[in-house]
C-alpha cells in the first residue's frame, strides 16, 4: 500500500524505476552474454522521454523564484497599506484640519504600529504556563481522589 501511495503522490519514484531496469539489463550484457539490443533501445527512448519531460517542470519551478521576496516574506494577516503618492495632487486636501469628529485621536493612537496586544511575544509563554497549571491541577485532583478511596 505504501508504494502505491508514494507513486501516486510524487512522480520521482516512477522515473527511477526505468533507470533501475536499464542497469539490470545492462549488467548481463557486460558479463559476456549476448546483449539484447531491442530492450536497450526502448530504455534509451524512455530515458530521452524522461529527459524531455524534465525541462518542463524545471521551467515551472523557476517562475515562483521570480516572485517578489517582500510578498513571500510577508506573514502578517493585515492588508497591505495603500500607497500614498509623495506629492499630493491638490493643496486643499492637505490643508484641511482634522477635528474631533474626524477620528484624529484614533489615527494618532495607531501610529505605534502595535497589534491588538502589545505583548505578542508572551503568547507562547502564557500558553505553556496554562498547560503546566492544568497538568498540575489534574495530577493533584487524581491524587486527591485516589487518596479518598
From Swiss-Prot:
Could you tell me which residues belong to the region Disordered? 1-118
Biased composition range(s): Basic and acidic residues: 40-50
Q: Name one GO biological process term.
A: neuron differentiation
Q: What keywords are assigned to this protein?
A: Differentiation, Membrane, Phosphoprotein, Transmembrane, Transmembrane helix
Q: Where is the protein situated, by its record's location annotation? A: Membrane
**Entry superkingdom:** Eukaryota
Q: Which residues lie on this side of the membrane: Extracellular?
A: 146-149
Q: Which residue stretches does the UniProt record annotate as biased composition, category Polar residues?
A: 1-12
Membrane-side (Cytoplasmic) residue stretches: 1-124
Q: Could you tell me which residues carry Phosphoserine?
A: 10, 90, 95
Q: Which residues form a coiled coil?
A: none
Q: In which tissues is it expressed?
A: Expressed in the brain, including hypothalamus, brainstem, and hippocampus. Expression is high in 1-month-old mouse brain and then declines in mature mouse brains at the age of 3 and 7 months.
Q: Where does this chain mainly localize? A: membrane
> What is any one of the record's Gene Ontology cellular component terms?
mitochondrion
* Transmembrane regions: 125-145
Q: Where is the composition biased (Low complexity)?
A: 20-35, 51-68, 80-97
- Which membrane topology describes this protein? Single-pass type IV membrane protein
- Specify the signal sequence span: none
UniProt xrefs under PANTHER family: CELL CYCLE EXIT AND NEURONAL DIFFERENTIATION PROTEIN 1 (PTHR36683:SF1)
> Subunit structure, briefly?
Homodimer. Interacts with AHI1.
Q: Which family does it belong to?
A: Belongs to the CEND1 family.
Q: What does this protein do?
A: Involved in neuronal differentiation.
Protein's UniProt name: Cell cycle exit and neuronal differentiation protein 1
Q: Which organism is it from?
A: Mus musculus
Q: Gene name?
A: Cend1
